[in-house]
């Protein structure tokens, strides 16, 4: 597609141009129309405003970035990657004295400064001013040091500003290395040559081509370096890391099922033996040569050995020790893809697009006009990084952090002995030693792996597509002025007035790095100030050059490049010339070139230069926007008379970078930082110089200052800013008007087009300003500024005007000239009102017909956007108040003022409510809290009403985007969190409720959310007390007391569902029992003093308290118990015989042996309760008989410990009762599980905040914590599948007693033996044993009834039902071996076919249980 077609198509998509014939000398006609090029969707006022629910959180779009989401291991609620778990590294510098503390008069604050460092302000977050105001106040310091550091004293939540979802952030990294691209290629070619020679000459095998995976030649060098970094082939196989290594090789998720196998096979076949051979060779060389000789063998330069030896030592040292080149560290300037394409710059966007016939490339069946490159028309699409290729490694944040740890470990292992002081503590690194090692690596190139780094990553990587901030952060944090997403479009930033963001200035970028990740020396795009915030992880070392030394430093870079090119221009291979020549002729080398082409970013660019022949109009040198890859040793910079400053950027600190300041940064470990650019009014004095520098460097301009000034005059209400803009643009307007006059005099009539695209000169690469001349020659065209065109005009004798020898209008029409204007005359008239210089009359028409001006504005500039309030005010003040036009304007203006007041009032109310939000107390135990509906329906309705009014209002005002943003957030928030609301995860629901308090939501939302939370809270308490049978009297009385039991019951009546009626009945029964007991107590208290209270009545009261676990205060219970115990002791002292209940021993013995549940009728007489009159072993009197009885008791107690593991038995009691419960956790048929199931796993708990994993066979979800003692780590390889121990295939048979604490038969024997004891253990040991046996017996009987017929497994029983019972048994740790064995075998037979299908298809099965 030609450049002319590009312009036509873009102009047509964005807005159809309006062509006119006018007389230039008479100025622009007042009715001229402008082709407005706003890129927003309908109802979207401008790119600086928030236009959707998602962009209300992140001011970006997802249109030019695809998250690299791949098939992951099937899991529910994967264990979150918590920022708190990240091991960060800090750089520490030995202080050269105490840092000076200096008072800064403009800010009224103190800052600290050390020698060779930058000013550092340390403030609490509540003391922070507006970021741009702070920048303006410290500009005097920034102009001297280049940077200013602001360190925030961390508050309770130090990750408040972390506006990314760390679990869903995916990105492509660039591969950085410690030498130049040329030398890196030399190393790689040497590797392939050695590998080829090894296979063909040493191993005597045939190796002709490199394997291909997914239609791409495998990068063996990268594969080997990744595997070696992870510990080698065996370690990667053991840890199942092949899928991750595949991502690091840039392979996509759709082939992950076969990728691991392919990579493993390729490595074993080609590289494994080579690794062993290399290790043996290295060991042999180590015996013969010292380490320096080994290192010099790895890397040699192009000069001959003799010359290298003869070269002066000081010259070698200068290059080798002071000036270095590091691959892929270059900082890049972002530009719109289509502008780069039109201007002939290399583009990289399409090179990453997968070819698909009929989609990416048209065919005969393709509809007319279809063009894949414009599938996202109407949006700013930025070109991809030149370092992003099809082989770029893909990471999520967790995987990248793990890779950074592996890199850190590898470097420590290699250099720890040489740098003992550096790695003495892994959490802190001495700065000087850190720098020394870094520059040592640059000079010696000892590292065999790349440093994968993400530089300038678009903020769209954490966009709505991966569901980030709306679920993570309260709106008060989103609206925080120090949230970097808000800074580019801050009210004090001129970037808010951009029509078209050609350079991604209004969106933030991210850097993600590890140890020795580097961003090379660079100056900010267009000298714009920037702010960098280190969100997470380790410290960065930041170098900065003072702005006044910018030219000196650029000269140093140029000199370094010249010397580098002269001395190290042609690296030499370590492979001999004959071997290399032979290797280059092989098919293996050609296969390597195929792999190199996919990985080499220099070959991915797509150029489409749209130009005249070189002899017609000279073109300009084009650059791709990358800055230098040179690294200088700090002392070398200082020695060249350049001031260099250093600082460290820790987590939670900001670095302000000032215009013309060169900076460079190096990471000390894993970090994630964010960068934002902004344009304060003070930047305007650098804007002209920045434009010239951009043109001189051959970079594509990112903005036009003159266009920005006019937009500021049109849209800003700030009188100071408006005056500054007028002063700055006045000279340009005069010059433009004079050139317009000359053009009219020389040519007369030209075509005029109004549009807003490509106002960049093809000759100088400078912005053309408010107008441009488009010279078209056939299908080609060139843009020139009006000034450039006038200079190029020639006038031969015949009077015909020509340019470069081609007539402007000859009869053949070879050359045509068209004038394009950025603004219409009406808009210019408003913007330039007040400029009284006569030449401006050639630039605009001073026509006082404001009604016509209004019509022009409505049909051009503001056709798809709202009108700024100041323009309406201007038109009202310049028109007759008696005209209909004025009355119409004033009516709209007055309505807008009323609407503005309503919006202000609503925003103030909303902010007051949001700021008053505190942590919610949900209550505990029986003391549960009714949750308030924070925002009334009235507030949500008011917001909706305001939104409708604001949306229909045609006038733009500052409160408008806030209302739109709030409305979209309130609408989208319930949708984004629907899964949480519909689920039963109480922790997530509570967290959601807390977040919701800062959003005006409908009452229907609040009602549903609060009702669900309250119900789940109630059920959680019910399970703790009534199912797990916890003793209430041992609980905190502030949470569990009798008065609170009533409120707990009322709470349940309000919030429970119909399915909870049985549970409410149990609570009611407990209350009635309490009332009955209290009635008995009242009867005791009413008796007169002579009356006596029966001891049996007191015992009945205590028995009820124990049996029903009534929430009686422990002091009351202890006092009653004390009275009874004292009476019994008195009887003993008086030789009064206490009759023990021995009559029913034979009955209960027989019932227990027969597994008859009727034994519970007699249990209270033998379970250590009040009715069990046997003395406690702890009260042994010491008589001979008592000693014999004590001996029998101890034997029984030992037997109990052996069988029941008494201590563990007490710990698992709640889970036994919970898992053996068949009332509240009833069997749910398979077809109803998706709707009705609320309890999962062996533990039979609800879906909690911990990670869960699904069994591939039974489809049950299991908590990871419940498998292998929580040590199961689900791999991210989808080839590896989890199968629970119940579905485990026969070949992986697991001992059935795995996890069993006791067998039912053993428990029965213990109970039978306890019946004959004369001394019993302290309560509640016996009671727990009897209760557990009753539950287990009931469970066994029910299971036999449901699953067995005549002692055999019922073949009609579904495996789903059988596994339900097996699952509960395993969770209870109670063994029914004679029943579970046949049930497991039955399931294994049923599951055999499914297991076979999985294994036959290459799936790897894990159970989470050691084999």
UniProtKB/Swiss-Prot annotation:
InterPro entries: ARID_dom (IPR001606), ARID_dom_sf (IPR036431), JmjC_dom (IPR003347), JmjN (IPR003349), Zinc_finger_PHD-type_CS (IPR019786), Znf_FYVE_PHD (IPR011011), Znf_PHD (IPR001965), Znf_PHD-finger (IPR019787). CDD domains: ARID, PHD_Ecm5p_Lid2p_like. GO terms for biological process: cell wall organization; cellular response to oxidative stress; chromatin remodeling; regulation of DNA-templated transcription; regulation of gene expression; response to oxidative stress. Present with 259 molecules/cell in log phase SD medium. It comes from Saccharomyces cerevisiae (strain ATCC 204508 / S288c). This is Protein ECM5. Residues 118-159 form the JmjN domain. GO terms for cellular component: chromatin; cytoplasm; nucleus; Snt2C complex. Pfam families: ARID (PF01388), PHD (PF00628).
